Amino acid sequence: MSRRCAVTGKGVQTGNNVSHSNIKSRRRFLPNLQVNSLMSDLLREPVRMRLSAHGLRTVEHRGGIDAFLLSTPSVELTVELRKVKRRMVKIRDAAAAAA
């Protein structure tokens, strides 16, 4: 599993540690990734994703996982999230046709 946020795309960055005597050594800046289970109202099950703290705030700001996935173009989503979105659209369309 890569160290990349599924929502924002934040990944590993590189830079330097700089000592008091100005000696530079290479280092990596890792994103604050957490594995989260967000409850989907349409699917009636949790969706597990690896999100950065900023990505989690983005999803919540957009109204939850359902609203986020349905409003985001599929091109901007990861392969796993596209599959979840397809399932959501299928269930939403079936419910709309039944009503």
Curated annotation (Swiss-Prot):
Task: List all disulphide bridges recorded for this chain.
Answer: none
Question: Single GO molecular-function term?
Answer: structural constituent of ribosome
Instruction: State the UniProt keywords alphabetically.
Output: Ribonucleoprotein, Ribosomal protein
**Coiled-coil parts of chain:** none
GO CC terms for this protein?
A: ribonucleoprotein complex; ribosome
Question: Pfam families from the entry?
Answer: Ribosomal_L28
**Is Ribosomal protein among this UniProt entry's keywords?**
yes
Gene Ontology BP terms: translation
Q: Which HAMAP family match?
A: Ribosomal_bL28
Q: Which NCBIfam families match?
A: L28
The family classification in the record reads:
Belongs to the bacterial ribosomal protein bL28 family.
Q: Any idea what this protein is called?
A: Large ribosomal subunit protein bL28
Lineage, opening ranks:
Bacteria, Pseudomonadati, Pseudomonadota, Alphaproteobacteria, Rhodospirillales
Q: Which gene encodes it?
A: rpmB
